[in-house]
Swiss-Prot record:
Catalytic activity: glycyl-tRNA(Ala) + H2O = tRNA(Ala) + glycine + H(+); a D-aminoacyl-tRNA + H2O = a tRNA + a D-alpha-amino acid + H(+)
Known function: An aminoacyl-tRNA editing enzyme that deacylates mischarged D-aminoacyl-tRNAs. Also deacylates mischarged glycyl-tRNA(Ala), protecting cells against glycine mischarging by AlaRS. Acts via tRNA-based rather than protein-based catalysis; rejects L-amino acids rather than detecting D-amino acids in the active site. By recycling D-aminoacyl-tRNA to D-amino acids and free tRNA molecules, this enzyme counteracts the toxicity associated with the formation of D-aminoacyl-tRNA entities in vivo and helps enforce protein L-homochirality.
Keyword tRNA-binding: yes
EC class: hydrolase
Lineage: Bacteria, Pseudomonadati, Pseudomonadota, Gammaproteobacteria, Pseudomonadales
Domain comment in the entry: A Gly-cisPro motif from one monomer fits into the active site of the other monomer to allow specific chiral rejection of L-amino acids.
HAMAP family: Deacylase_Dtd
E.C. no: 3.1.1.96
GO molecular function, one term: Gly-tRNA(Ala) deacylase activity
Subunit annotation: Homodimer.
GO biological process: D-amino acid catabolic process
Gene name linked to the record: dtd
Protein name, entry field: D-aminoacyl-tRNA deacylase
Keyword annotations of the record: Cytoplasm, Hydrolase, RNA-binding, tRNA-binding
Amino acid sequence: MKGLLQRVRGARVEVAGEIVGAIDQGLLVLVAVEPEDTREQADKLLHKLLNYRVFSDEQGKMNLSLKDVGGGLLLVSQFTLAADTRSGMRPSFSTAAPPALGAELFDYLLQQAQGQHADVASGRFGADMQVHLVNDGPVTFLLQI
């Protein structure tokens, strides 16, 4: 399971012109599910997302987590993040989970996040989404669980 987290000042996801998820300051996370992923990996990713110290303290050091700052968490499914890009001129998606497994684990991750954090939003699994964000930093990390 991969999570590409971006520290944002604000972000929103639209589907067919309708805003389906939005946050103010916090983390936008693009989530890719791979074929061998499990709920245990989703739990580990969520723990890391909520506790990873990517926000600055009073001294300007990245020492505060999403929980510490009370920021929003916007989860967006993105199977292309799991692509194999090592050869050729076209990405291969054989390393991405089948849609049913991807949807199951993304929904599980979202439900767990909503139970553990106050401000959680999401895109719509499998939809053609437009993601709008204001990067803060920019600060971007690829988490692989």
